[in-house]
Amino acid sequence: MSDSKALRVATIFSLTLLATTALAQTKPQPYNAAPWENVLYGAAYYNEYMPADLQPGRLDKDIALMKQADISVVRMGESTWSLWEPEDGRFEYAWMDRVVDAMGKAGIKVIMGTPTYSIPTWMYHEHPEVLVDLLTGPKPAYGMRQNMDISNPTFRFYAQRLIRNLVEHYRNNPDVIGWQVDNETGSYNANNPEVFTGFVDHLKQKFGTTDNLNKAWFLNYWGQDVNGWENMPPRQNATSTGYKLEWSRWQQMRVTDYLSWQAAIVREYRRPDQFVTQDFSDAVHRDVNEFEVAKALDIVSVNPYHGTQDHMDGQIQAQAGDYYRSLKHANYLVTETNAQTTYWASSFQYPPYDGQLRLDVYTHLSSGANMVEYWHWHSIHSGQETYWKGVLSHDLEPNRPYAEVSRTAHELQKIGPQLIDLKITNQVAILYSHDSLNAIDFMPFASTGPRWTFGPASADYSSEVNQLHTALYNLNVGTDFVFPEDPDFSRYKVLIVPMLYIADDALLQKISDFVKNGGHVLMTFKSGFANENSAVRWVRAPGPMREAAGFSYQEFSNLEKPLALKDDPFHAGTDENKVSYWAEFLMPEHAKALAYYDHPFFGKWPAITENNYGNGTLTYEGTYLSDTLQKAVVEQVLKEASLTGPDQQLPAPVHVKHGVNRQGKQLHYYLNYSSEAQTFTYPYKEGTDLLTGNAVTSSAKMTLQPWDVAIVEEK
């Protein structure tokens, strides 16, 4: 950016801040809305995406269809900065006002998004420096969304100016109930000069001196000591695991700062009954610390996309719900999910079977969602997401999905007040570590490449977390997620600790204390191996966990091919009695072996151990288990914690979720993820199936049709 442009931006920024101060509330008020009366159900809506000749009259037709279907909420505005501000400093609202007003007259609520994730062409033309410098390559050309440096001061100037104008314009509109800041935000792999300068400032604050940094990162290796902050090398070719880990933390901090910054601006103007949220994409992220971002939000939202047809089993939705509900231990929103087919090409078009859209809605509600919205209302006719279809297809006419959405919405109008604000109390939690996710990615334990080469990882931290959650899900055990930052884990009976590769001594002590005080821990390999700076501990593994684990080890090995466990101790069967990728040579000191490798060399060491420590137990897996073995080990831990019962007797396609509704009554969701009817025995107190109105007695036989659901409210 030229000096004249920089001066112009700085001057405008200062004047804008002065001018907007009078508009902003002197003290932002906390979110304070009356409880919603019903579950919200709707879709993202983009009248502006319609073919130009359809736009004027299409709005009324869409609203008529929405009213006929009992749609109650739409999300709008987050994708079209160029319409809000077609040229620098000229703001247009009429195009959206007509939509918001029409929705309001129809009784449909609006969530408005800040449109900052896709910059307009005029900004790129005037300020190409706002584009991200990729860590992995050159600056990209304009054309893709999410291609800017979110910490760039020029970008931030334009973003804050737009946000202030937008929120001020709609703050008094009673139909706008909330604000979504940005959209599926990430760091975008940014390596701009300002990003690196900020990183060095972060290191100064954290480590104080370069001498402390050198010691923490062991930079005397290969003679890479940093002698003066001005000599800090760039990230691109860094080999230090400490450097790479801290850089990943810095990228997470940038995202937290950016979204907190947007949320703070919105709060200056919004009404106290307008919430602030962010729609996280469905997966957990290497460059986003959702736990920290959630502190800046009133409500957490997530966009979970999932398998359809024969690949819909509810696990993806359940894991997303469990994770995002756990961030604030509160109900959450689903801001996007499958309407019809998904994907950016026509090579992955699998529309849902009859019943799957409806089942998906109740799946989310059973995990604690208070809103379900589709992406999106109507399919678009051109662009990258042409084949990411909405409720209406490209012909914009009512169709099979619309009929199912209508059926579901009509049901929610009747029973939604008994479903909203479901309170879920679980006794099992998975400890999730962003640091371990990234550090294991830097030093993978499983590779598809031949020896001495680096191929794509065939298993990693995420696959282990997913496997463990799937085991719990398939056992019908409600699950929360906890994080290293949580003060303690005492609310749970069982703590699942997947590959806690990065941990300071305090976190490991907290886990040991949990066991000592009567908790049950299932911990998997690589846990306790490295400290908070990704340096391997200089004591025998598993470091501070040694006493609680009851073993130590000095060696480990990759496994070139899967090994069986001797005598199939968990009755997994020949095909599934297998472990892969990695084996730690566990030497029991107090622990007992639960399984040994069936191998002439590896067979001298246990693959799985269990140790009684204090009033609790710690079960440890020194290798990567098959899915069937993992489920069996998890089930054994649950039995020892007295957490099994009738829910584990359900037929495999049926899943059950429990919670207490706003009226203080226990709800039991039964969900059939199969194309066949399923019959089972209802084991709880008598109640009423809210969807049919039928009485349900204890020990009664219940039958669910394919892709069907029952919701029993106890008396």
Show the residue positions of the predicted features:
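Short, acidic/polar
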Residues: 51-66, 282-293, 353-361
